[in-house]
Amino acid sequence: MKYERTFKTIVAVGVIGTLLATVSSMTWADDNAEAKPLALRKIMQDLGKNMQVITDGISREDWELVAKIAPLVADHPQPPLGEKMRILSFVGTDAGKFKGYDEKTHQAAQALGQAATRQDGPAVISAFAKLQNSCLACHQGFRKPFLEHFYDKR
């Protein structure tokens, strides 16, 4: 009877230890998964490249190029749903502000493309300024906290 109780205790401790080890290794794996770049990072890098192409097009008055690239900025890809939920959860009460910047960027890039299609240089410059301002405002409000939270960069 005494040995049976000791055996059950040893088995119970072994099972609990195994479960704890499994859970802690899963948590560690999740922490590493969070350190992987978000899809948002690739989206932002592509947006940056497209903005450089637009800047080049404007400087050369290549309105066809600007009109071609502006929709890539206006209708940029969205992060996968799970990532989007993580991002919105992180921004919390600023989610409306974050979405607002995205909408302003969308509208300004659409206006930029339309102005370029009309070959209206002053309207292109005005729309591009609005686009740059919406990008800058979002970056100033969210870039540093994102890097700290999602990439542990301080």
Residue ranges and their predicted role:
Residues 2-15:
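Bacterial N-terminal signal peptides that target proteins for export
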Residues 17-21:
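Alpha-helical transmembrane segments
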Residues 30-60, 64-154:
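Sequence context surrounding c-type heme c attachment/ligation sites in exported
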